[in-house]
A protein has these predicted regions:
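Hydrophobic alpha-helical segments
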Residues: 231, 255, 259-266
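Structured cytosolic regulatory/catalytic domains appended to multi-pass membrane proteins
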Residues: 119-120, 127-130, 249, 253, ...
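C-terminal helix/juxtamembrane-tail motif
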Residues: 265-279
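Pol beta-like nucleotidyltransferase catalytic core
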Residues: 220-223, 243-260
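Generic macromolecular interface patches on structured domains
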Residues: 56, 163, 262, 266-269
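Hydrophobic alpha-helical membrane-embedded segments
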Residues: 1-8
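Soluble catalytic domains of membrane acyltransferases
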Residues: 9-12, 16-228, 235-238
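Charged, glycine-interspersed solvent-exposed loop segments at helix/strand-loop junctions
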Residues: 230, 240-243, 270-272
Length: 279
């Protein structure tokens, strides 16, 4: 099979600028907020939070120009990353490649961050585990155990950029499986086999508001935080130390909390609880 998803993708700016993306973003609506300029002579690793059910805020902001990414961050080319398994589906993979998506594998990340300045890879850090915690009014993040994206950033001297989407968890209702043995067992088994899980969720229908797979209309506001420089490896050092990883993670979490606390009373007035890092 063609390995474009591992080698930088096959993006089409024409496809990314189709009018349909504006209709998609305006449905919720989705908007993008910038905390700081990004230097196009550098590379970046965006951490996207929370995962939500299917990360539709990330789709609207980073695979199209519907929210004006290139106007806010001139000279920066974003690549939203996803699992390799998504590129095994004929035709669907071609759409993913056309909108600038690529694999989240180590090989793909290395290739993208080595391709030249102005590259930003976007990683939905919490992954499948976090999707099971996506409930309206909450923001339970799986982050403390996630050090791989920080290690990758240090290897390539790419600044880390915390990104938080208010409303991502509010566009679907999810049946809580934490106390339902059979559902939870099936979900964890599926995750082990295929690398992702299947939350039991529902939205609205096309002709009704009660149940269906269409997401509920709820504003999604994605705030892109300030870039965090990463430590340099010493001559002869091939891997960052645990201290370097944890100290960088602490700075990352601090900036993530800063943008959450700055905007939570504006964009999350109906929240049930504040952001929590649960794992």
């Amino acid at each position: 099979m063609d390995q474009s998803h591992e080698n930088g993708g096959r993006r089409s700016e024409r496809f990314r600028r189709l009018r349909i993306w504006h209709y998609f973003a305006n449905y919720f609506p989705v908007s993008l907020v910038k905390e700081a300029d990004l230097d196009p002579s550098k590379n970046y690793v965006f951490g996207y939070h929370p995962h939500g059910i299917v990360s539709l805020g990330a789709v609207a902001n980073f695979v199209s120009e519907a929210t004006g990414f290139s106007d806010l961050f001139p000279g920066i080319t974003p690549f939203l990353l996803t699992l390799n398994s998504n590129f095994r589906i004929p035709f669907y993979r071609d759409i993913l490649l056309a909108i600038g998506m690529a694999s989240v594998s180590r090989r793909s990340c290395n290739n993208l961050l080595s391709s030249g300045p102005g590259t930003a890879i976007v990683i939905v850090v919490g992954g499948a585990t976090e999707s099971l915690k996506a409930h309206p009014g909450t923001a339970d993040l799986v982050l403390k155990k996630r050090l791989g994206f920080i290690r990758m950033a240090i290897h390539h001297q790419a600044s880390l950029v915390p990104t938080f989407s208010f409303g991502e968890n509010d566009i679907y209702e999810q049946i809580d499986s934490s106390n339902k043995g059979i559902i939870l067992t099936v979900q964890k088994t599926v995750q082990k086999i295929v690398g992702f899980t299947l939350p039991v969720f529902y939205g609205r229908g096309i002709f009704n508001y009660n149940v269906g797979l269409v997401p509920f209309r709820h504003p999604i506001v994605t705030v892109v935080g300030k870039p965090i420089p990463v430590p340099k490896l010493e001559p002869g050092q091939t891997e960052p130390t645990e201290e370097q990883l944890l100290s960088t993670q602490a700075l990352y979490i601090e900036e993530l909390m800063n943008i959450y606390n700055k905007y939570k009373d504006i964009y999350a007035k109906d929240r049930k609880q504040d952001l929590q890092i649960v794992a």
